[in-house]
Amino acid sequence: NTFVASFIGSPAMNLLEGTIEGGTFTGKDVKITGLHSTLSGPVTLGYRAEDASIGGDAPSVNAPVYSMELLGDATMVTFRIAGAIATVKADKDFRAKIGETVAATIPAATCHLFDATSGERL
């Protein structure tokens, strides 16, 4: 459930509010297609920072950079999306200015869906 997802792992799972329709999740600044789900309606989508990447042919996110943390082997790029903090683990050489809009890709196969009300995994 989202309670466990929010504190297990470092960084914790990213949780984004939105809706799903026809296998496509849509939220503010986020669109992820190809989800294996027949659900329709409000959901919470979860993904791990290490499963996402900066750039890509069909980016899922276009949002301004909120912060960056250099870790030595990687750079953690944080976005503020619809009031939530979302993180992507980028290459160690990636650099962007705070406030600069950056595209990121979140693969559908690595996403988890949760009930928007109860927080239980779907």
Descriptions of predicted regions:
Residues N1-G9, M13:
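Conserved beta-strand-loop-alpha-helix hinge in the C-terminal portion
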Residues P11-L15, G22-L122:
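Non-catalytic connector elements of ABC transporters
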